[in-house]
A protein has these predicted regions:
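Intrinsically disordered, low-complexity regions enriched in Ser/Pro/Gly/Gln/His and often acidic
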Residues: 1-6, 18, 37-39, 47, ...
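Secretory targeting and sorting signals
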Residues: 2-30
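N-terminal helix-cap/turn-to-beta initiation motif at the start of protein domains
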Residues: 30-46, 53, 73
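Contiguous, well-ordered beta-strand patches that form the walls/edges
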Residues: 51-136
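Short, solvent-exposed mixed-charge patches
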Residues: 142-144
Length: 144
């Protein structure tokens, strides 16, 4: 009976370790996925995206038909609600941030410079290979 219990105990430990190996990294990734953004970046922002914005970004296809006003809500944890999806702003040093989570761009992320002055948020592309993300985010946003 002792040998049987040892096998059972061993199997239980294997299951526990397997579950821990999956759950712990997922929880850690979720915790670090979005980090706190500066307070002056938090809030609701609006801007009108034009056909010229899409053209400048080099966008083609269906996204170029999405012209008009957009509102994004930036939360303190870096989550950004825009259109019908949630992107993530991750602050970096030197007034820069990375943007990721745009469905048509996934898993790519873009690098942008940001500045807030006089209730205006300016996002400037530094490096981003996804034209849809560039066309949507690059430009001047007004605090709503």
């Amino acid at each position: 009976m002792g040998n049987r219990w040892r096998k059972l105990a061993w199997r239980c430990w294997v299951v526990v370790l397997a579950v821990a190996a999956v759950v712990i990294p997922v929880a850690s990734a979720a915790d670090t996925e979005a980090s706190a953004v500066p307070a002056n970046l938090v809030g609701r922002w609006t801007r009108t995206v034009t056909a010229a914005d899409w053209k400048r970004a080099g966008a083609t296809g269906f996204v170029t038909s999405f012209v008009g006003p957009y509102t994004m809500a930036v939360k303190a944890n870096g989550k950004v609600s825009i259109i019908d999806f949630t992107a993530t702003f991750s602050p970096l040093s030197g007034g820069r941030l990375s943007i990721r989570g745009v469905p048509v761009c996934y898993p790519k992320k873009g690098l942008y410079r940001w500045k807030v002055a006089n209730r205006k948020l300016t996002l400037t592309k530094l490096k981003d290979t996804c034209a849809a993300e560039v066309g949507l985010f690059t430009g001047v946003w007004t605090r709503a």
